[in-house]
Protein backbone atom coordinates (compact mmCIF):
# COMPACT_ATOMS: atom_id res chain seq x y z
CA UNK A 1 0.00 0.00 0.00
CA UNK A 2 1.57 3.25 -1.15
CA UNK A 3 1.78 6.41 0.93
CA UNK A 4 -0.44 8.22 -1.59
CA UNK A 5 -3.14 5.55 -1.29
CA UNK A 6 -3.00 5.68 2.51
CA UNK A 7 -3.33 9.46 2.40
CA UNK A 8 -6.33 9.22 0.07
CA UNK A 9 -8.04 6.67 2.34
CA UNK A 10 -7.38 8.82 5.40
CA UNK A 11 -8.93 11.81 3.62
CA UNK A 12 -12.01 9.76 2.71
CA UNK A 13 -12.37 8.60 6.32
CA UNK A 14 -12.13 12.18 7.57
CA UNK A 15 -14.84 13.32 5.18
CA UNK A 16 -17.08 10.39 6.12
CA UNK A 17 -16.50 10.98 9.82
CA UNK A 18 -17.43 14.64 9.48
CA UNK A 19 -20.57 13.73 7.54
CA UNK A 20 -21.62 11.13 10.11
CA UNK A 21 -20.93 13.46 13.02
CA UNK A 22 -23.20 16.10 11.49
CA UNK A 23 -25.90 13.51 10.77
CA UNK A 24 -25.87 12.00 14.27
CA UNK A 25 -25.69 15.39 15.93
CA UNK A 26 -28.68 16.55 13.90
CA UNK A 27 -30.72 13.44 14.72
CA UNK A 28 -29.85 13.58 18.43
CA UNK A 29 -30.69 17.29 18.51
CA UNK A 30 -34.01 16.61 16.80
CA UNK A 31 -34.92 13.88 19.28
CA UNK A 32 -33.97 16.09 22.23
CA UNK A 33 -36.17 18.89 20.87
CA UNK A 34 -39.13 16.67 19.91
CA UNK A 35 -39.37 15.03 23.34
CA UNK A 36 -37.96 17.84 25.49
CA UNK A 37 -35.28 15.45 26.71
CA UNK A 38 -32.80 17.98 28.08
CA UNK A 39 -33.69 21.29 29.70
CA UNK A 40 -31.72 24.23 31.00
CA UNK A 41 -29.89 23.31 34.21
CA UNK A 42 -30.20 19.54 33.75
CA UNK A 43 -27.57 17.16 35.05
CA UNK A 44 -27.47 14.28 32.57
CA UNK A 45 -26.11 10.93 33.70
CA UNK A 46 -24.79 9.22 30.58
CA UNK A 47 -24.77 5.45 31.17
CA UNK A 48 -21.67 4.00 29.55
CA UNK A 49 -21.42 0.25 28.95
CA UNK A 50 -18.32 0.23 26.77
CA UNK A 51 -20.33 -0.55 23.64
CA UNK A 52 -20.47 1.48 20.43
CA UNK A 53 -23.87 3.01 21.18
CA UNK A 54 -23.10 4.49 24.59
CA UNK A 55 -19.71 5.77 23.38
CA UNK A 56 -21.40 7.53 20.45
CA UNK A 57 -24.10 8.94 22.72
CA UNK A 58 -21.57 10.42 25.13
CA UNK A 59 -19.50 11.79 22.25
CA UNK A 60 -22.48 13.51 20.63
CA UNK A 61 -23.88 14.86 23.92
CA UNK A 62 -20.51 16.38 24.84
CA UNK A 63 -20.36 17.94 21.38
CA UNK A 64 -23.89 19.34 21.66
CA UNK A 65 -23.16 20.65 25.14
CA UNK A 66 -20.56 23.01 23.66
CA UNK A 67 -22.98 24.51 21.15
CA UNK A 68 -26.42 24.17 22.76
CA UNK A 69 -28.40 27.34 23.56
CA UNK A 70 -29.04 25.93 27.05
CA UNK A 71 -26.67 25.02 29.86
CA UNK A 72 -26.53 21.44 31.13
CA UNK A 73 -24.05 19.07 32.76
CA UNK A 74 -22.96 15.66 31.49
CA UNK A 75 -21.41 12.98 33.67
CA UNK A 76 -20.47 9.46 32.56
CA UNK A 77 -21.30 6.44 34.71
CA UNK A 78 -20.27 2.84 34.18
CA UNK A 79 -21.55 -0.13 36.17
CA UNK A 80 -18.81 -2.74 36.57
CA UNK A 81 -20.83 -5.93 37.11
CA UNK A 82 -17.72 -8.03 37.72
CA UNK A 83 -18.06 -10.10 34.59
CA UNK A 84 -15.06 -12.39 34.06
CA UNK A 85 -12.46 -10.83 31.81
CA UNK A 86 -13.94 -7.32 31.98
CA UNK A 87 -11.07 -4.90 31.20
CA UNK A 88 -11.46 -2.50 34.13
CA UNK A 89 -8.81 -0.05 32.88
CA UNK A 90 -10.36 0.75 29.49
CA UNK A 91 -13.18 3.12 30.44
CA UNK A 92 -11.31 5.09 33.13
CA UNK A 93 -8.42 5.68 30.74
CA UNK A 94 -10.72 6.78 27.91
CA UNK A 95 -12.90 9.02 30.09
CA UNK A 96 -9.86 10.60 31.73
CA UNK A 97 -8.55 11.49 28.28
CA UNK A 98 -11.82 13.33 27.57
CA UNK A 99 -11.69 15.28 30.81
CA UNK A 100 -15.32 14.42 31.55
CA UNK A 101 -16.54 13.79 35.10
CA UNK A 102 -17.06 10.05 35.47
CA UNK A 103 -17.86 7.35 38.01
CA UNK A 104 -17.39 3.58 37.99
CA UNK A 105 -19.85 1.71 40.21
CA UNK A 106 -18.62 -1.72 41.27
CA UNK A 107 -21.35 -4.28 42.01
CA UNK A 108 -21.02 -8.04 41.61
CA UNK A 109 -24.36 -8.60 39.90
CA UNK A 110 -22.76 -11.27 37.71
CA UNK A 111 -22.49 -13.72 40.62
CA UNK A 112 -26.05 -12.95 41.73
CA UNK A 113 -27.42 -13.66 38.25
CA UNK A 114 -25.43 -16.88 37.90
CA UNK A 115 -26.56 -18.02 41.35
CA UNK A 116 -30.26 -17.25 40.86
CA UNK A 117 -30.80 -18.24 37.22
CA UNK A 118 -30.54 -21.94 36.21
CA UNK A 119 -28.09 -22.82 33.44
CA UNK A 120 -29.60 -22.27 30.02
CA UNK A 121 -32.34 -19.91 31.20
CA UNK A 122 -32.52 -16.26 30.21
CA UNK A 123 -30.49 -13.93 32.45
CA UNK A 124 -31.64 -10.67 30.87
CA UNK A 125 -34.64 -9.98 33.10
CA UNK A 126 -32.83 -10.25 36.43
CA UNK A 127 -29.65 -8.65 35.12
CA UNK A 128 -31.49 -5.61 33.77
CA UNK A 129 -33.54 -5.18 36.96
CA UNK A 130 -30.42 -5.25 39.12
CA UNK A 131 -28.58 -2.87 36.82
CA UNK A 132 -31.55 -0.51 36.59
CA UNK A 133 -31.98 -0.35 40.37
CA UNK A 134 -28.31 0.43 40.96
CA UNK A 135 -28.20 3.16 38.31
CA UNK A 136 -31.48 4.71 39.46
CA UNK A 137 -30.24 4.89 43.06
CA UNK A 138 -26.95 6.43 41.92
CA UNK A 139 -28.78 9.09 39.88
CA UNK A 140 -30.86 10.12 42.90
CA UNK A 141 -27.84 10.19 45.22
CA UNK A 142 -25.88 12.42 42.81
CA UNK A 143 -28.85 14.68 41.99
CA UNK A 144 -28.93 13.77 38.29
CA UNK A 145 -32.11 15.03 36.64
CA UNK A 146 -31.92 12.82 33.53
CA UNK A 147 -30.56 9.33 32.86
CA UNK A 148 -29.40 8.89 29.25
CA UNK A 149 -29.36 5.40 27.70
CA UNK A 150 -27.81 4.48 24.36
CA UNK A 151 -30.74 2.74 22.65
CA UNK A 152 -31.14 3.69 18.98
CA UNK A 153 -33.87 3.46 16.35
CA UNK A 154 -33.10 -0.18 15.55
CA UNK A 155 -33.40 -1.12 19.23
CA UNK A 156 -36.81 0.53 19.34
CA UNK A 157 -38.07 -1.37 16.29
CA UNK A 158 -36.57 -4.68 17.47
CA UNK A 159 -38.30 -4.26 20.83
CA UNK A 160 -41.60 -3.56 19.09
CA UNK A 161 -41.44 -6.82 17.14
CA UNK A 162 -40.01 -8.75 20.09
CA UNK A 163 -43.05 -7.78 22.16
CA UNK A 164 -45.46 -8.45 19.29
CA UNK A 165 -44.04 -11.87 18.39
CA UNK A 166 -43.31 -13.21 21.87
CA UNK A 167 -45.36 -11.09 24.27
CA UNK A 168 -48.57 -10.27 22.44
CA UNK A 169 -48.11 -6.55 23.08
CA UNK A 170 -47.65 -3.56 20.81
CA UNK A 171 -44.93 -2.01 22.92
CA UNK A 172 -41.55 -0.53 22.03
CA UNK A 173 -39.04 1.72 23.82
CA UNK A 174 -40.20 5.28 24.55
CA UNK A 175 -37.65 8.03 23.82
CA UNK A 176 -38.45 9.49 27.25
CA UNK A 177 -40.07 7.94 30.30
CA UNK A 178 -40.53 8.27 34.03
CA UNK A 179 -39.15 5.36 36.05
CA UNK A 180 -41.64 3.11 37.83
CA UNK A 181 -40.66 4.54 41.21
CA UNK A 182 -41.19 8.08 39.89
CA UNK A 183 -37.74 9.27 40.95
CA UNK A 184 -36.01 9.44 37.58
CA UNK A 185 -36.55 10.58 34.00
CA UNK A 186 -34.91 8.29 31.45
CA UNK A 187 -34.06 9.57 27.96
CA UNK A 188 -32.82 7.91 24.78
CA UNK A 189 -31.07 10.62 22.73
CA UNK A 190 -30.18 8.16 19.92
CA UNK A 191 -33.86 7.32 19.29
CA UNK A 192 -33.73 8.69 15.72
CA UNK A 193 -30.27 7.28 14.86
CA UNK A 194 -29.70 4.19 12.72
CA UNK A 195 -27.45 1.50 14.13
CA UNK A 196 -25.39 1.23 10.95
CA UNK A 197 -24.55 4.94 11.14
CA UNK A 198 -23.54 4.60 14.79
CA UNK A 199 -21.46 1.51 14.04
CA UNK A 200 -19.56 3.22 11.25
CA UNK A 201 -19.09 6.36 13.34
CA UNK A 202 -17.73 4.32 16.26
CA UNK A 203 -15.29 2.59 13.94
CA UNK A 204 -14.00 5.85 12.49
CA UNK A 205 -13.71 7.39 15.98
CA UNK A 206 -11.87 4.24 17.14
CA UNK A 207 -13.74 3.95 20.43
CA UNK A 208 -12.24 1.27 22.74
CA UNK A 209 -15.17 -1.15 22.47
CA UNK A 210 -15.71 -3.64 25.32
CA UNK A 211 -17.69 -6.79 24.37
CA UNK A 212 -20.33 -8.19 26.74
CA UNK A 213 -19.59 -11.77 27.82
CA UNK A 214 -22.62 -12.40 30.03
CA UNK A 215 -25.27 -12.22 27.32
CA UNK A 216 -26.25 -14.84 24.76
CA UNK A 217 -29.42 -15.92 26.55
CA UNK A 218 -32.72 -16.85 24.92
CA UNK A 219 -34.13 -13.32 24.83
CA UNK A 220 -31.05 -12.06 23.05
CA UNK A 221 -31.23 -14.94 20.58
CA UNK A 222 -34.81 -13.94 19.85
CA UNK A 223 -33.71 -10.33 19.45
CA UNK A 224 -30.95 -11.44 17.08
CA UNK A 225 -33.51 -13.24 14.90
CA UNK A 226 -35.62 -10.10 14.74
CA UNK A 227 -32.54 -7.97 14.00
CA UNK A 228 -31.68 -10.24 11.06
CA UNK A 229 -35.27 -10.04 9.81
CA UNK A 230 -35.21 -6.23 9.89
CA UNK A 231 -31.78 -6.10 8.25
CA UNK A 232 -33.06 -8.36 5.48
CA UNK A 233 -36.07 -6.09 4.96
CA UNK A 234 -33.78 -3.06 4.87
CA UNK A 235 -31.74 -4.62 2.06
CA UNK A 236 -34.66 -5.93 0.00
CA UNK A 237 -37.15 -3.13 0.61
CA UNK A 238 -35.38 0.25 0.94
CA UNK A 239 -37.40 2.70 3.02
CA UNK A 240 -39.47 0.05 4.81
CA UNK A 241 -37.78 0.55 8.20
CA UNK A 242 -38.17 4.31 7.93
CA UNK A 243 -41.89 3.90 7.23
CA UNK A 244 -42.30 1.48 10.14
CA UNK A 245 -40.61 3.90 12.50
CA UNK A 246 -42.87 6.70 11.26
CA UNK A 247 -45.83 4.43 12.00
CA UNK A 248 -44.74 4.18 15.64
CA UNK A 249 -44.99 7.98 15.75
CA UNK A 250 -48.37 8.09 14.01
CA UNK A 251 -50.72 5.83 15.97
CA UNK A 252 -54.50 5.90 15.45
CA UNK A 253 -56.14 4.16 18.46
CA UNK A 254 -59.57 4.28 16.77
CA UNK A 255 -58.22 1.95 14.07
CA UNK A 256 -56.78 -0.63 16.47
CA UNK A 257 -58.49 -3.02 18.91
CA UNK A 258 -57.49 -1.80 22.37
CA UNK A 259 -60.58 -0.72 24.33
CA UNK A 260 -58.32 0.91 26.92
CA UNK A 261 -57.12 3.42 24.35
CA UNK A 262 -60.37 4.08 22.54
CA UNK A 263 -63.94 4.06 23.86
CA UNK A 264 -65.80 2.01 21.26
CA UNK A 265 -68.90 1.85 23.51
CA UNK A 266 -69.66 5.52 22.90
CA UNK A 267 -69.68 5.23 19.11
CA UNK A 268 -73.13 6.15 17.80
CA UNK A 269 -74.50 6.33 14.31
CA UNK A 270 -75.66 9.69 13.02
CA UNK A 271 -79.35 9.91 13.83
CA UNK A 272 -81.35 11.46 11.00
CA UNK A 273 -84.62 10.91 9.20
CA UNK A 274 -84.36 9.78 5.54
CA UNK A 275 -85.91 13.04 4.30
CA UNK A 276 -83.33 15.12 6.17
CA UNK A 277 -80.47 12.99 4.86
CA UNK A 278 -81.59 13.50 1.25
CA UNK A 279 -81.48 17.28 1.72
CA UNK A 280 -77.76 17.27 2.61
CA UNK A 281 -75.43 18.14 -0.22
CA UNK A 282 -72.97 15.37 -1.03
CA UNK A 283 -70.25 18.00 -1.20
CA UNK A 284 -70.78 18.83 2.48
CA UNK A 285 -70.39 15.24 3.66
Swiss-Prot record:
Cofactor, free-text remark: Binds 1 [4Fe-4S] cluster per subunit. The cluster is chelated by three Cys residues, the fourth Fe has a free coordination site that may bind a sulfur atom transferred from the persulfide of IscS.
Family classification: Belongs to the TtcA family.
GO MF annotations in UniProt: 4 iron, 4 sulfur cluster binding; ATP binding; magnesium ion binding; sulfurtransferase activity; tRNA binding
Cofactor(s) demanded: Mg(2+); [4Fe-4S] cluster
Location relative to the cell: Cytoplasm
Top-level taxon in the UniProt lineage: Bacteria
Reactions it catalyzes: cytidine(32) in tRNA + S-sulfanyl-L-cysteinyl-[cysteine desulfurase] + AH2 + ATP = 2-thiocytidine(32) in tRNA + L-cysteinyl-[cysteine desulfurase] + A + AMP + diphosphate + H(+)
Residues that hold [4Fe-4S] cluster according to the record: 124, 127, 215
Motif (PP-loop motif): 49-54
Subunit structure: Homodimer.
GO terms (BP aspect): tRNA thio-modification
Pathway named in the protein's UniProt entry: tRNA modification
Additional comment: The thiolation reaction likely consists of two steps: a first activation step by ATP to form an adenylated intermediate of the target base of tRNA, and a second nucleophilic substitution step of the sulfur (S) atom supplied by the hydrosulfide attached to the Fe-S cluster.
GO cellular component: cytoplasm
Gene that produces this protein: ttcA
Keyword annotations: 4Fe-4S, ATP-binding, Cytoplasm, Iron, Iron-sulfur, Magnesium, Metal-binding, Nucleotide-binding, RNA-binding, Transferase, tRNA processing, tRNA-binding
Listed CDD domains: TtcA-like (cd24138)
Its biological purpose: Catalyzes the ATP-dependent 2-thiolation of cytidine in position 32 of tRNA, to form 2-thiocytidine (s(2)C32). The sulfur atoms are provided by the cysteine/cysteine desulfurase (IscS) system.
Keyword Ribonucleoprotein: no
Listed name of the protein: tRNA-cytidine(32) 2-sulfurtransferase
E.C. number(s) listed in UniProt: 2.8.1.-
Amino acid sequence: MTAAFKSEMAQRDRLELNKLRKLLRREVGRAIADFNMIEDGDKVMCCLSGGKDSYAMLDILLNLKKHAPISFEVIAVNLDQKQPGFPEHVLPEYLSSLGVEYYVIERDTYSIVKDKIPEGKTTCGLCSRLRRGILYDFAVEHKCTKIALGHHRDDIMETLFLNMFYGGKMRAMPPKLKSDDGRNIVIRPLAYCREKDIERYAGLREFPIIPCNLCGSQENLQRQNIKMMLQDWDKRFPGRLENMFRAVQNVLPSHLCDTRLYDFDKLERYSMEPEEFNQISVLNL
